[in-house]
Amino acid sequence: MVASVGRRSKQAAPQMNGGFFMLKGISPIISPELLKIIAEMGHGDELVLADANFPGTSIGQKCVRCDGHGCAEVMRALLTLFPLDDFVEAPLAVMQVPAGMFPGDKAPIWEAFRAAADTDLPTAKFDMMAHDAFMERAKKAFAVVQTGETALYGNIIIRKGVVRA
């Protein structure tokens, strides 16, 4: 006869935003797969945070899905775990919008990107890239995070900085 030693009650695991989490201090938006990807990244590596229309799987060397969350929301969560690169003038890059599409030729979502960047590096500047140049840079990125973002021109490339002790 075998005794049942160390059995735990069949209590449900804690939930947040509909998903299970087993680590403290890490947003449940960050999946285990995404956590592994950002842990593997080094200084200067880039990550594409892509909207729902972006061809993430065909463009990216690696593509991880983050459906149900917007790009700025994912960006805020990521920037609690790694810094933006402060060794370059513009550690952020967005795709230029066609002239006249938005007031001031700025996609409204860029304000949310700015607010997210300000949580880590308020002096961070954005590169404004032509569509084709952005796509070529995205192909070289460490990975693409495909979000559920529905805002037009809701893509951003973020460059990882150095974690200082």
Per-range role (PLM):
Residues 22, 26, 66-70, 101-105, ...:
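Catalytic cores of large soluble enzymes that bind and process phosphate-bearing ligands
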Residues 66, 75-112:
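Glycine-rich nucleotide/cofactor/substrate-binding loop typically near the N-terminus or early
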Residues 45-48, 62-63, 85-94, 124-126, ...:
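Structural motif
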Residues 101-165:
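Glycine-rich, aromatic-bearing surface loops/beta-hairpins
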Residues 3-21:
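Short, Lys/Arg-enriched N-terminal segments with co-localized hydrophobic residues
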Residues 45, 49-53, 60-77, 81, ...:
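Conserved mixed alpha/beta catalytic, RNA-binding, or beta-rich assembly cores of soluble enzyme
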Residues 18-67:
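Long, hydrophobic N-terminal alpha-helical segment
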